[in-house]
Structure formats: C-alpha cells, structure tokens
C-alpha cells in the first residue's frame, strides 16, 4: 500500500502511544496522528480518514483537520506571512503552505488572497502551491454537453467578464453581459455550460438554462 501525500487516506490504527496513535502507512511505515487529532474512543484496528502532509521536520504526519485545498486542486487562499524564500498561505493546517517566489505571478502581499494550485514539488517532495494556475489547467478538450451543471471557481476579471476554473480542471469564461449577480475572485458557484470552443475554453453562465418541451 502506498499512501497519498496531500490527500485524504483511509488508514488503520496500529498502536497507541502517549502522544497519539500510529497508523499503518504500508510501504511508508507507521505514521503519527498526534493526540490533539485522535477521535475519542479510538483504538487499534479502527480505520480513520486522515489527511497526510509533512511536518516542520519533513516527517510524514496525519491530521483529522480539513485543509482548504488538497494536492492537484485549486483554491483561493490568504497569505499568512512572507520571508526571503517566498510566501506562506493559510490552508487550515498547523504548517502553512509554501509558495516560492518563482511560482508567484506578482510578488504576494501578506493578508491578500490569491488563486493557487497545490502540487507536490518533484525535487523536494514537499507540498507547494503556485499562483501560475494556467500551467496546471488541462489542455484536453472538455467533453461537456450543452446545459451541463458544473462547479466553478472564479479566477480573475478580464475585459470580457470573469475567467473561471471549471470542475477543478478546465478554463472557463463568463461574459459580463450574462452576469446578473456580484462576483469576486475566490467564489465557488454552480454554473452551466453554454458552449465549448474549439480551443477548449468553456463558455459558461450562472443561470440555469430554460428547458424546452
């Protein structure tokens, strides 16, 4: 069994210790779930749904906290602090999510929110984020049907309207003249497919299409 870093995993409790419980990580060995996250009544043999990430000493560790983003997902997160290496985002866990300067489209500012993509850095095997989200959108042609309901994340304002990330995978566009409610970056909404262009861009709108017949 191989566990998935930056994702939820169903892992079995193998033993209890004074500072938490250890979970069966298969080929990755035993993984600590610290006491503060151990459910009441938890015992060896129980299977827990936990999120796995690296602690400050780069050790694989488990938590029952719910992060604001998982690996291979997009989200709008706030900058908690900045140092000489990059920015650190609040994603709901004890250890903040790192965005190196090379992955920032513009220099990030503390307290501001940005659309990012979370991924595992190939060189360091750490969970990192990138504000260059266009690099992580699928180049495949979406196979959507007209009027199909999709989940979208509002990405950025353009001269034509708002760019959106569709189903955590594709690029979409809402035209200004078809928007009848206030929108802002980071909003998550239900939308409907109006058209998929030859270049793969999904034209979407928020109002549910009128059904005929």
Residue ranges and their predicted role:
Residues 19-22, 85-88, 160-163, 201:
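Short aromatic-glycine-enriched beta-strand elements
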Residues 69-70, 76-141, 155:
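Intrinsically disordered, low-complexity linker/loop segments enriched in Gly/Pro
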Residues 1-49, 54-56:
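N-terminal, positively charged regions that mediate nucleic acid binding
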Residues 145-201:
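Aromatic-anchored, glycine/proline-accented short structural segments
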Residues 204-213:
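Single conserved hydrophobic/aromatic residue that forms the stacking wall/gate
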Residues 11-13, 45-58, 77-81, 112-125, ...:
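Flexible glycine-rich surface loops and low-complexity tracts that mediate binding to linear polymers
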Residues 29-42, 95-107, 170-182:
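Beta-strand/loop nucleic-acid-binding surfaces
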Residues 1-5, 55-75, 102-104, 130-146, ...:
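Short boundary/loop segments of OB/S1/cold-shock single-stranded nucleic-acid-binding domains
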């Amino acid at each position: 069994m191989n566990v998935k870093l930056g994702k939820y995993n169903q892992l079995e409790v193998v033993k209890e210790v004074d500072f938490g419980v250890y979970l069966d990580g298969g080929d990755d060995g035993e993984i600590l779930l610290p006491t503060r996250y151990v459910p009441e009544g938890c015992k060896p043999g129980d299977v827990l749904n936990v999120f796995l990430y690296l602690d400050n000493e780069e050790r694989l560790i488990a938590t029952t906290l719910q992060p604001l983003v998982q690996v291979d997902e997009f989200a709008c997160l706030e900058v908690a602090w900045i140092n000489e290496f990059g920015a650190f985002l609040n994603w709901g866990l004890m250890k903040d999510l790192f965005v190196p300067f090379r992955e920032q489209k513009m220099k990030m500012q503390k307290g501001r929110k940005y659309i990012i993509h979370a991924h595992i850095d190939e060189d360091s095997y750490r969970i990192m984020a990138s504000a260059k989200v266009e690099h992580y959108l699928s180049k495949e042609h979406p196979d959507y049907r007209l009027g199909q309901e999709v989940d979208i994340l509002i990405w950025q304002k353009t001269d034509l309207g708002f760019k959106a990330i569709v189903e955590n995978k594709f690029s979409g566009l809402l035209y200004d003249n078809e928007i009848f409610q206030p929108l802002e970056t980071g909003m998550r909404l239900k939308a409907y497919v109006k058209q998929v262009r030859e270049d793969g861009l999904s034209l979407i709108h928020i109002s549910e299409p009128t059904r005929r017949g």
